[in-house]
Amino acid sequence: MKTIAIDAMGGENAPKAIVDAVLKAKPKLKDTKFVLFGDEEKINELIPAEQKDRIDVIATSEVIIDSDEPVKAIRRKKNSSMVVAANYVKSGKADALFSLGNTGALLACGIFIIGRIKGVERPALMPTLPSAKSEDGFNIIDVGANAQSKPEYLVQWAQMANFYAQKIRNIKNPTVALLNNGAEDDKGDALHQEAYKLLKATDLNFIGNAEGNDLMEGKADVIVTDGFTGNATLKAIEGTASVILRLLKDSLLNNGLRPKVGALLAKPGLTALKKRFDTARYGGAVLLGVNAPVVKTHGRSNIRPIYYTLLQIDKMLSQDLVGEYKKYFSESR
């Protein structure tokens, strides 16, 4: 039986949204056990008596909040829901770690407590984002786990993302592109020029450089980038999408009868558009390169994205993604 350790106190809607998502996922994931860490009384009162099978609750007395400095927090708040859950995974009692809490602290838990895979230079954070070309979206790695990068790191990140796209997204031969400031192969600074050469020499389906305007068009299944650029890109995409949706809603609903009628007529198309750019169904961002799946979902998440993230984690465990990484990087050393 697979076991997922869950920080039940992370995020704005904890613990209710987390418990509700577990209860929703439980009938579908019949071979999975859920261990929730946090305020035992609050968590237990949300779980009906008839639903307590395959759900364990472990009491913790502290919570890492967003304003906490990540590394200091995991050292000082040793009885926090996130740290205790991470140690539970490290001990082998659980197979994966999931949290909606402080991103930096979760990355620190993954790297310093659960530990990186031998042969992996630097773990990296990777979400799946929507694209206009495909309902499958695209992966972008790294989006902030590393402030500084080397060309060799980008190659390993591309290799890990390639495995993920194959095993979890069911893409037989994923296309991989390097985020750069031009399409030509000599574009970019020394880091990107060397990364380009190294990626081209691998057996990946590397299609060259991708510019910022290519991402949402779906030029590649996997986009590899340094952590600084990736983080800025992710926030720009999220912010732009949020503003466009807000402006669209405001223009349709707050400008009289005619736009409202138009919105009603356009509803099927708008529904399809909303579905295409619905990030919840992709699950959370994954810290790749550590000894167990470590997955982060946005702190504002409600039941739906949490539910899909639980399905995502379960598939990662079923496909033994970490085992594939360990085998690959041990053989390539």
Curated annotation (Swiss-Prot):
Its main location: cytoplasm. It is found in: Cytoplasm. GO terms for molecular function: phosphate:acyl-[acyl carrier protein] acyltransferase activity. It comes from the Bacteria. The keyword Transferase applies. Pathway: Lipid metabolism; phospholipid metabolism. GO terms for cellular component: cytoplasm. Disulfide bonds: none annotated. Its EC number is 2.3.1.274. Belongs to the PlsX family. This is Phosphate acyltransferase.
